[in-house]
Amino acid sequence: MLLMLPGLMAPFLISLVMIFRSKNAALKGDFVNRLTNIRLIRPGILPVFFLIMPLSVVVSIFISLFFGGSMSQFQLAEGFSFSTGFVPVLLLLLLAAGFEELGWRGYAFDSLQSRHTYFKASVIFSVLWSLWHFPLIFVNNSYQYEIFHESFWYGLNFFVSIIPLGMIISWICIKNGKSIIAAIVFHFIVNMSQEILDITQTTKCIQTAVLLIVTIALIAYDREMFFSRAHLGKRST
């Protein structure tokens, strides 16, 4: 499990090297601004920001009831669904959100969207982000290890679920001036929403479908943003 921490830090560290080795002062300034400027976060987006994930969990539990799911899923979970053995799980969830988004939204996604529409960049990024988690199925006691040993299909669902989640985080980030803070906070909300209630893996499969519907709705609602080409080529690396 000690190998998890360097793995979590890798996106951030690689991004720091790429950014600060660059001779582009604007790139460095933009990174610092998106990391520190809380005013980039739009108050009007906050209800969506805080409610998408908790509501997706609640809706998924209600749907699961029609397929034999239990009302006990509305109870608070007695503990986390995995263990680390070296740092508290809550701290790990926060570190995961922080280090991942510092790298992913701080540099990687920004680099992709300079070459592609937001839609295409989001799809590419989400698939790559999903695959990035794959080695964790071999890390004893990790969440991915636990669910893959419970059921191959539950493990597969985890990787599929990351794709609509990545699209949603991209939308949240873009709508808030590409704020890295917004991405970190939303990512942490995602992590906590999966742990706070006693939901089953079957319900999490249902949640993947719910998140896919939410993603399609966001794309339809903000089609102009997702498919705009106005921003292409504006960021040099």
Language-model features: locations:
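Small-residue-rich segments of transmembrane alpha-helices in multi-pass membrane proteins
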Residues: 40-41, 115-122, 188-194
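Alpha-helical transmembrane segments of multi-pass membrane transport proteins
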Residues: 52, 101, 161-162
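Functionally important transmembrane alpha-helices
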Residues: 147-210
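Histidine-centered divalent metal-coordination motifs
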Residues: 101, 133, 187, 191
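Hydrophobic/aromatic residues in alpha-helical transmembrane segments
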Residues: 59, 108, 165-169
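Specific transmembrane helices
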Residues: 1-97, 125, 138, 157, ...
